[in-house]
């Protein structure tokens, strides 16, 4: 579109974020909302992109209230600068020692849903809230609930021959679906629509044009359209995956755990169910005593089951730095989860949700698991186009499967916009460059710099200028001075050693803690020696020759055969090292309780006892891609073996779980791995090279699910390191390295029953029900109108407390 801009890689691409937060550490009686505008460049290596030193505070919109549609008034100086930078500014290139004309373009904005409406000009409230569907949406206002619902708005995204389209009463009452998906409106079409609108509405006021809320949701012409290239951008405003995932997760948790006042399956939802669906067994039933019976839904837990889930979460242990303290969110006595931050919901949604609700029937659990897998794949640090296309096809089916189970009140704007996330990922790439986690942490730092509450914005500006000046000047000093403290799970760099050192002896990690001596017995000596030999690259040709000869078992015969072969070869430095390897290690080895390697922090099983975190789980990848020959275990000892010529190698002595079907089960669809924790591997092969290990943790199932007792779900973790470096980074949102193999969702679980007949429903007084009907206020947990821009950031912009047990 702009080849002259693209041909020079030195031209800068920017992203912009603006969001409101309360600039006080402690709660204040007077609400105050401050809006910083943050700009970040994308022309950086992945480990530097969107980090705090490269997030620039361009302006601050003062409080005490949010600027609503008048935010463009404050953005006008920034837009003027961006227009000038698009033309170009003379800049010195230090690498080429020359001046060049540097140009800058703003790629997109990153905001939560309310701020999305302020910056784009399309209001994100009401039944037309979706900025992709716009006026082509089929959402409607619930008559009893009084809020917008996107129930039965996703069948139109399905293939034309899909069976769901023909179901008359499985979704909306007496309704089939023949329409296709809403058209994708181009940037030029949007520009033509907003050209006649006002640019600068009054600050703090909203402008309503004719047809607002019925045929459109435009409130203004956004100031970003003043940028000459803005109408050429395919993705102008990002849907924030962080807040969408949190709201989706909260709705699931509150509904399944039947939290009073927050569940989407309340009395109003049951009354709306009668109007819009054919589910008579779920409707409120008038009893002879004048009260109404609310049948117990099959998708909700009983009070005891909810308490069991909270107790399970309170006792859950995960690796250091993996998550914040989830135990603080679990109310065991009440059976509720409270005070969950965005990253807590992130971990719960993508990792723990299918385990927590494993007792639900398949037609409820399977779509919840598919939602969990969808966000897990979407949030991977590496995305593949073919897999994103499958995800874009799968998510409408998943939402339709949820619509068969949950009431219309469950489906608000947050559930609906998830249908557009895979498409935005196709346009914009991985979500770690388009979500709000880095900006929330930046605002959390800004909050802690406020010293003068009477001059909030001035305090933030002064502190930011000091930080920016210090970081700029630090580039003129030694690079080592830029890192004032050691980073998590730091490992040593490879040191200068002999060029003849064998690959297996090259250092890869560092121990921590007190050192002890351990004397290995004969069986341990033989197993350790053979394991080191067969994992040495230089021994590979000998090992292949030994296997072709078929002269015996590797663990019993290879060591002596290898010695004999080396005696026939002329001496050289490498051969001498191989002979030292063949002679085996010393019987006395060094032992530690902690070891850092591959970006992981490993503990022995005994060292983790009594701690809030657990780092003893280990996983070794097998040869096949299906995971059938993978090994899972726990670390019993951490040994350093010593050989001649001052060569050392670190081994983990592990207790391996039974890899057969009796001890390890792999879900063929979702690839979840379950381990029977009381079954062990029969063969004596306990050792594994520390450099070849990955970390897992084992999550037991809640106690109320009797069929899963004794089994744990093995969850793999990712090393918390910088990209392509050995030095781990600070706290960042958890992501998988790559997407799982995304398969098309074709299995349709029949909905056999929606009512739990084994549990009595709750009775409601007629007076209470009448009072609810007379109350025209929306549900307290309405996601589209939950004052997200006022209070949710008080949680999210504070750094989570990541547990570290030494």
Where are the model-predicted features located?
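Long alpha-helical repeat solenoid scaffolds
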Residues: 303, 314-317, 322-382
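Short, conserved interaction/coordination micro-motifs, predominantly
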Residues: 11, 244-247, 278-281, 285-288, ...
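Domain-level cores of phosphate- or acyl-group-handling catalytic modules
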Residues: 1-296, 342, 365-463, 476, ...
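C-terminal catalytic/scaffold cores in eukaryotic proteins
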Residues: 293-294, 300-303, 307-328, 438, ...
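Hydrophobic, aromatic-enriched, well-ordered structural segments
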Residues: 403, 407-410, 447, 451, ...
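Acidic, serine/threonine- and proline/glycine-rich intrinsically disordered low-complexity regions
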Residues: 3-6, 181, 202, 506, ...
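Active-site-proximal segments of catalytic enzyme domains
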Residues: 1-4, 38, 46, 576-577, ...
């Amino acid at each position: 579109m702009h080849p002259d801009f693209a041909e020079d890689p030195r031209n800068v691409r920017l992203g912009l974020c603006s969001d409101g937060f309360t600039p006080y550490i402690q709660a204040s009686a007077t609400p105050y909302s401050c809006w910083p505008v943050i700009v970040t460049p994308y022309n950086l290596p992945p480990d530097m992109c969107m980090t705090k030193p490269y997030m620039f505070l361009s302006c601050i919109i003062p409080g005490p209230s949010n600027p609503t549609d008048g935010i463009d008034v404050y953005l006008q100086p920034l837009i003027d600068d961006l227009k000038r930078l698009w033309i170009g500014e003379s800049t010195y290139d230090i690498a080429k020692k020359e001046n060049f004309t540097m140009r800058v373009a703003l790629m997109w904005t990153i905001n939560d849903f309310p701020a999305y409406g302020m910056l784009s000009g399309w209001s994100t409230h009401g039944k037309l809230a979706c900025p992709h569907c716009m006026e082509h949406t089929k959402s409607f206002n619930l008559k009893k609930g009084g809020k917008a619902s996107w129930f039965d708005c996703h069948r139109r995204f399905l293939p034309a021959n899909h069976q769901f389209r023909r179901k008359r009463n499985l979704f909306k009452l007496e309704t089939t679906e023949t329409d296709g998906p809403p058209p994708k409106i181009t940037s030029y079409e949007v520009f033509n629509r907003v050209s006649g609108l006002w640019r600068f509405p009054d600050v703090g006021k909203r402008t309503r044009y004719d047809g607002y809320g019925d045929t459109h949701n435009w409130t203004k012409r956004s100031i970003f359209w003043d940028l000459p290239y803005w109408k050429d951008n395919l993705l102008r405003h990002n849907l924030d995956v962080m807040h969408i995932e949190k709201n989706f997760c909260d709705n699931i948790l509150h509904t399944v755990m039947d939290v009073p006042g927050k569940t989407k399956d309340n009395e109003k939802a049951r009354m709306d169910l009668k109007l819009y669906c054919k589910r008579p067994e779920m409707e409120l039933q008038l009893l002879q005593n004048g009260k109404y019976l609310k049948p117990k839904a099959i998708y909700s837990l009983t009070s005891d089951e909810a308490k069991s889930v909270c107790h399970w979460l309170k006792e859950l242990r995960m690796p250091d730095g993996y998550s914040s303290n989830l135990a603080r969110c679990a109310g065991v006595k009440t059976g509720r989860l409270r005070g969950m931050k965005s990253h807590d919901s992130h971990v719960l949604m993508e990792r723990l949700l299918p385990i927590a609700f494993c007792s639900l029937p398949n037609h409820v659990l399977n779509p919840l698991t598919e939602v969990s897998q969808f966000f897990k794949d979407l949030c991977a640090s590496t995305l593949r186009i073919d897999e994103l296309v499958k995800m874009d096809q799968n998510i409408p089916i998943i939402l339709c499967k949820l619509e068969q189970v949950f009431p219309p009140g469950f489906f608000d704007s947050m559930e609906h916009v998830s249908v557009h996330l895979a498409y935005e990922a196709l346009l914009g790439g991985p979500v770690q460059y388009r979500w709000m986690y880095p900006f929330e942490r930046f605002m959390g730092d800004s909050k802690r710099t406020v010293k003068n509450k009477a001059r909030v914005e001035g305090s933030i500006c002064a502190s930011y200028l000091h930080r920016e000046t210090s970081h700029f000047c630090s580039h003129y000093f030694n690079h080592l001075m830029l890192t004032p403290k050691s980073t998590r799970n730091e490992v040593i760099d490879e040191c200068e050693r002999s060029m003849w050192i064998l690959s297996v002896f090259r250092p890869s990690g560092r121990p921590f803690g007190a050192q002890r001596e351990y004397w290995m017995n004969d069986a341990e000596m033989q197993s350790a020696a053979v394991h080191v030999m067969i994992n040495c690259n230089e021994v590979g040709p000998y090992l292949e020759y030994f296997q072709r000869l078929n002269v015996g078992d590797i663990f019993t015969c290879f060591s002596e055969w290898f010695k004999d072969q080396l005696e026939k070869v002329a001496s050289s430095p490498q051969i001498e090292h191989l002979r030292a390897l063949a002679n085996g290690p010393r019987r006395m080895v060094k032992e530690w309780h902690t070891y850092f390697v591959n970006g992981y922090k490993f503990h022995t099983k005994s060292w983790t006892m009594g701690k809030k975190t657990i780092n003893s789980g280990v996983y070794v990848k097998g040869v096949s891609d299906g995971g059938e020959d993978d090994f899972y275990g726990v670390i019993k000892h951490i040994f350093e073996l010593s050989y001649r010529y001052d060569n050392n190698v670190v081994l983990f002595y592990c207790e391996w779980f039974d890899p057969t079907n009796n001890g390890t089960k792999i879900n063929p669809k979702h690839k979840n791995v379950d381990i029977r924790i009381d079954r062990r591997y029969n063969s004596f092969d306990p050792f594994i090279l520390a450099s070849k290990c990955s970390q897992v943790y084992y999550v037991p199932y809640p106690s109320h699910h009797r069929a899963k007792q004794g089994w744990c779900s093995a969850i793999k973790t990712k090393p918390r390191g910088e990209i392509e470096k050995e030095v781990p980074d600070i706290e960042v949102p958890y992501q998988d390295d790559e997407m799982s193999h995304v398969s098309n969702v074709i299995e349709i679980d029949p909905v056999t029953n929606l009512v739990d007949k084994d549990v009595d429903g709750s009775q409601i007084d007629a007076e209470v029900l009448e009072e609810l009907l007379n109350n025209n206020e929306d549900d307290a947990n309405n996601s589209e109108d939950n004052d997200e821009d006022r209070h949710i950031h008080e949680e999210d912009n504070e750094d989570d407390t990541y547990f570290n047990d030494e």
